[in-house]
Amino acid sequence: MENKLLSSQEIQELRKSLPTWEEAEGKLVKRFKFTNFIEAFGFMTKIAIISESLSHHPEWTNIYSEVIIRLSTHDMGGITMLDYKLAKAIDAIKYE
């Protein structure tokens, strides 16, 4: 599958299967809350392994038990199928 910049219409259609993610400033964005820092960091570690396998890495912020993830394909200038694929994988980790 070719990685191309998705249109607004394509993003809205794909977001139907990612209802807890928002689109903001050309990125897919989601805030995750955990019980403590260890859980949050463990979650980030799992994402790091998947991200490395996809060669696609999130922009993220971690403050204690909260992780905010922003996904976009920087070299494409917006959201691509790679971001969608990573978002789906992240949700699978969180809700496994």
Swiss-Prot record:
Key word Lyase present: yes
Superkingdom per UniProt: Bacteria
EC number: 4.2.1.96
Enzyme class: lyase
One Pfam family of this chain: Pterin_4a
GO molecular function per UniProt: 4-alpha-hydroxytetrahydrobiopterin dehydratase activity
Protein family according to the UniProt entry: Belongs to the pterin-4-alpha-carbinolamine dehydratase family.
Protein name: Putative pterin-4-alpha-carbinolamine dehydratase
